[in-house]
C-alpha cells in the first residue's frame, strides 16, 4: 500500500456529510471528504440487453476480436465517436437513433454537415425504437428495431449501448446530505465544493463523473 493511505475494499455509504459506513459496519470519518465514485452506463430496458454481445463504453475497448458488424445505440457524442472509430477500422456500423437527429446539444448546421459526411462511412438510422436483441445460436445477435410501425432486423457481432450514463451518487446515499440533481449528479460550486441546500459543505469536494454531466467515459 501507499504511505498514509488506508484501503477498504468494500462498498460504503454516507451516514452524515463527513462519515461513511462500510458494508462490514465500520464507520470512517474525515474532516476533508472527496467524492469520486464515478458513473455507470444506463441501458435500455429491452429483452436481450444483458447478452454478452452487448457492451457499453466501459467494455467496448476490451474486445478480444474485432467485430465485422456493429450496431451502436445512441444519439450523443460517444455513439458518434465509436461509430466513426469502428467504421474507420473497417467494421460495418449501424447507428440506431431514437430521435430525428443526432448530437442534439450541437448546433443544427454543424450536425447537418457532420451527418452528410458521416453517412458516407456508416449507416445512421433515425427515428428507430429498439424492440429487442436476440441471440442467433452462433456468436451473432439480431437487433430488432421499429420504424413507422415497420419492424427491421440487423444482424451484428457486437452491440454498443451508448445510451447515456448516470452518476453513482445513489450508491452512496448522497442525496440525504448533499444536493443531487438530474441523473444523480452531485451539486457543486465553481470550486467543486459539494453543496447542501445550495451552500458549500465545509471540507466536501466532488471530482469526475459523479458530479459532472460531461462524462469522461
Which residue stretches match the model-derived regions?
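Glycine-rich active-site/cofactor-binding loop and its immediate structural neighborhood
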Residues: 16-44, 57, 62
Amino acid at each position: 500500500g501507499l504511505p498514509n493511505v488506508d484501503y477498504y475494499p468494500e462498498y460504503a455509504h454516507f451516514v452524515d456529510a463527513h462519515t461513511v459506513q462500510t458494508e462490514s459496519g465500520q464507520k470512517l470519518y474525515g474532516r476533508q471528504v472527496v467524492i469520486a465514485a464515478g458513473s455507470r452506463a444506463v441501458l435500455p430496458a429491452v429483452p436481450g440487453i444483458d447478452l454478452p454481445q452487448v457492451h457499453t463504453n466501459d467494455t467496448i475497448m476490451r474486445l478480444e476480436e474485432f467485430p465485422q458488424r456493429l450496431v451502436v445505440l445512441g444519439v450523443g457524442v460517444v455513439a458518434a465517436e465509436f461509430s466513426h472509430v469502428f467504421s474507420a477500422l473497417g467494421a460495418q456500423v449501424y447507428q440506431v437513433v431514437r430521435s430525428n437527429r443526432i448530437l442534439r446539444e450541437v448546433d443544427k448546421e454543424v450536425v447537418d454537415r457532420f451527418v452528410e459526411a458521416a453517412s458516407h462511412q456508416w449507416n445512421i438510422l433515425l427515428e428507430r425504437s429498439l424492440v429487442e436483441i436476440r441471440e442467433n445460436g452462433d456468436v451473432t445477435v439480431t437487433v430488432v428495431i421499429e420504424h413507422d410501425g415497420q419492424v427491421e432486423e440487423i444482424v451484428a457481432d457486437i452491440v454498443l449501448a451508448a445510451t447515456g450514463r448516470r452518476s453513482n451518487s445513489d450508491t452512496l446515499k448522497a442525496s440525504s446530505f448533499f444536493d443531487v440533481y438530474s441523473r444523480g449528479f452531485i451539486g457543486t460550486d465553481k470550486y467543486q465544493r459539494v453543496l447542501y441546500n445550495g451552500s458549500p459543505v465545509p471540507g466536501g469536494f466532488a471530482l469526475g463523473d459523479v458530479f459532472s454531466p460531461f462524462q469522461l467515459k
